[in-house]
Amino acid sequence: MQETADRIADAVAALRRGALLAYPTEAVWGLGCDPDDDAALARLIALKQRDPAKGLILIAGDMDQLEPWLAGLDALQRARLAESWPGPNTWLVPDNGRARPLLRGEHTSLAVRVSDHPLVRQLCAAFGGPLVSSSANRAGEPPAMSAADVRAAFGEAVTLLDGALGGYARPSTIRDLQSGETLRR
């Protein structure tokens, strides 16, 4: 639909200008930016009042978009990722040196996910790569469940790409690729 394509094109243009973008994901509204824009990363962390040591998630429309951050993984690790995506599965992968410090936080790993939300997939395809994804809320507050919640929390500090949530009841599972440990169900 042309209206959706136009809204996505506007969102991509905003991201390229360094904007913070709020968008619906599978379960909650996400807040993101260009993962290679240090100023946008710093603004996102400050706006959320998030501890920068925690790091952030990269969300992609397909696994190929994450390739620069996955370089160095072996075939078994890649197969494990591929069989769980797309979907609500976030993996902690060893940082190969590609991730910006604010993206990684104090960790030696990076959180990555391939979304199965159609709007997120279209957005990442139009952007040409993954985006930062963090729940759209201030630290310690519940995540936004609607565009109205986003506006109430952040006002005009973010660009909004309106759409429907994906129907999942909870945020993604988080697992460590090296240990296999599940950190959040």
Curated annotation (Swiss-Prot):
GO terms for molecular function: ATP binding; double-stranded RNA binding; L-threonylcarbamoyladenylate synthase; tRNA binding. The keyword Cytoplasm applies. Pfam families: Sua5_yciO_yrdC. InterPro entries: DHBP_synth_RibB-like_a/b_dom (IPR017945), Sua5-like_dom (IPR006070), TC-AMP_synthase (IPR023535), TC-AMP_synthase_SUA5 (IPR050156). One of its GO terms (cellular component) is cytoplasm. SUPFAM superfamilies: YrdC/RibB. GO terms for biological process: regulation of translational fidelity; tRNA threonylcarbamoyladenosine modification. Its EC number is 2.7.7.87. Residues 5-185 form the YrdC-like domain. It catalyses: L-threonine + hydrogencarbonate + ATP = L-threonylcarbamoyladenylate + diphosphate + H2O. The keyword Nucleotidyltransferase applies. Signal peptide: none annotated. It is an enzyme of class 2 (transferase). Keywords: ATP-binding, Cytoplasm, Nucleotide-binding, Nucleotidyltransferase, Transferase, tRNA processing. It comes from the Bacteria. It is found in: Cytoplasm. Required for the formation of a threonylcarbamoyl group on adenosine at position 37 (t(6)A37) in tRNAs that read codons beginning with adenine. Catalyzes the conversion of L-threonine, HCO(3)(-)/CO(2) and ATP to give threonylcarbamoyl-AMP (TC-AMP) as the acyladenylate intermediate, with the release of diphosphate. Belongs to the SUA5 family. TsaC subfamily. This is Threonylcarbamoyl-AMP synthase.
